[in-house]
A protein has these predicted regions:
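Conserved glycine-rich cofactor-binding loop
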Residues: 16-17
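Residue(s) in the substrate-gating loop at a strand-loop-helix junction
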Residues: 146
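Short C-terminal tail/terminal secondary-structure segment
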Residues: 4, 151, 229, 240-253
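Alpha-helical segment proximal to the catalytic Tyr-Lys
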Residues: 126, 175-176, 237
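Substrate-binding pocket helix/loop in short-chain dehydrogenase/reductase
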Residues: 97-98, 102-108, 197, 209
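Active-site helix of classical SDR
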Residues: 121, 162, 170
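Short, small/polar-rich loop/turn modules that mediate ligand/substrate recognition or access, typified
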Residues: 178, 183, 239-241
Length: 253
C-alpha cells in the first residue's frame, strides 16, 4: 500500500520530543522522507535510528537563527532534494502573569512561536519557487498554532498572543504564495498529553482547566495524525489559509 505522503520530503521542526516527534513518526510511517530538526541532537539521532537512517535525517538547528535555518534547508536538499512539506512545530510556552513577566521573556516567546515560523516558511517557499512550478505546486506548509490563539487563558498572555499571530501569519502567507501553488495552513491543537505538558496537566492548574472543558479529558498524541496527514497530502490541494482546530471541544468551555 502506497503511503499518503509517499514521495514527499518533509521537514519537522521541534522534532526531538512531544508533538514534533509524533509528527515525524506519522509522516515517516506514511512514506515521506523526513528531516527532523531541533536543538537536542542526541534525541534526534535516536529518532532517526527508530525511523530508519535511509529515509530520515537529523539536523541540529535553532530555528530562531536565520543562518541556521538556511543551513538546515541546505542539509535537507543535499540529502533528499527540495523540501516540499514543512511542519513548523517548534514552539514554547511561558506561564507567567503579564504584570510580572519581563520583556525579555515576552520576546523569547514571540521569537520562537512567530518569528521562527515566518523564517522557516519563507525559506521553504523561496526554495520551492526557485525549483519551479512542478515543485511549488506540491508545497505544503503546516504551522502549528493552538486553541490558545482563539481563547483567553489566564497567565499565558504571551503564548496566546503568539499563537493568534501564528494563525494570522498563516493566512497572510497563504494569500501571498497562492499563485505559486504553495498551500499554507495552520493546525491548532487543544490540550494534548505529551512529555512537555504532562507535569502541568497533572498539576493543580491543568486539572482545574481540564475540569472546565465539556468532555473533561485531554487528547492523546495521535489525535492530530489524520488532520496532519490531510494537510500535508495531495488531498488538500484546494485547502490553503485554513486554521484547523482539533481540540475535542475544549475551547467551548
Amino acid at each position: 500500500m502506497v503511503g499518503r505522503v509517499a514521495g514527499r520530503v518533509a521537514l519537522v521542526t521541534g522534532a526531538s520530543s512531544g508533538l514534533g516527534r509524533r509528527f515525524a513518526q506519522t509522516l515517516a510511517a506514511q512514506g515521506a522522507k523526513v528531516v527532523v530538526a531541533a536543538r537536542r541532537k542526541e534525541r534526534l539521532d535516536a529518532l532517526v535510528k527508530e525511523l530508519g537512517e535511509a529515509s530520515t535525517l537529523a539536523v541540529q538547528c535553532d530555528v530562531t537563527d536565520e543562518a541556521e535555518v538556511v543551513a538546515m534547508f541546505d542539509a535537507a536538499e543535499a540529502r533528499f532534494g527540495t523540501v516540499d512539506t514543512v511542519v513548523n512545530n517548534a514552539g514554547m510556552t511561558h506561564e507567567k502573569n503579564a504584570l510580572t513577566q519581563d520583556i525579555a521573556e515576552f520576546r523569547k516567546v514571540m521569537d520562537l512561536n512567530v518569528t521562527s515560523v515566518w523564517c522557516v516558511a519563507r525559506e521553504a517557499a523561496r526554495r520551492l519557487i526557485k525549483a519551479g512550478p512542478e515543485a511549488s505546486v506540491r508545497g505544503r506548509i503546516v504551522n502549528i498554532a493552538s486553541m490558545a490563539g482563539r481563547i483567553v487563558i489566564p497567565g499565558v498572555a504571551a503564548y496566546c498572543a503568539s499563537k493568534a499571530a501564528c494563525a494570522h501569519l498563516t493566512r497572510s502567507l497563504a494569500r501571498e504564495w497562492a499563485r505559486h501553488g504553495i498551500n499554507v495552513n495552520a493546525l491548532s491543537p487543544g490540550y494534548v498529553a505529551t512529555e512537555l505538558t504532562e507535569d502541568w496537566l497533572n498539576g493543580e492548574g491543568g486539572t482545574k482547566m481540564i475540569g472546565k472543558t465539556p468532555r473533561r479529558r485531554v487528547m492523546a498524541e495521535d489525535s492530530l495524525d489524520e488532520a496532519l496527514l490531510f494537510l500535508c497530502s495531495d488531498a488538500a490541494r484546494f485547502v490553503t489559509g485554513a486554521d484547523v482546530l482539533v481540540d475535542d471541544a475544549q475551547s467551548m468551555s
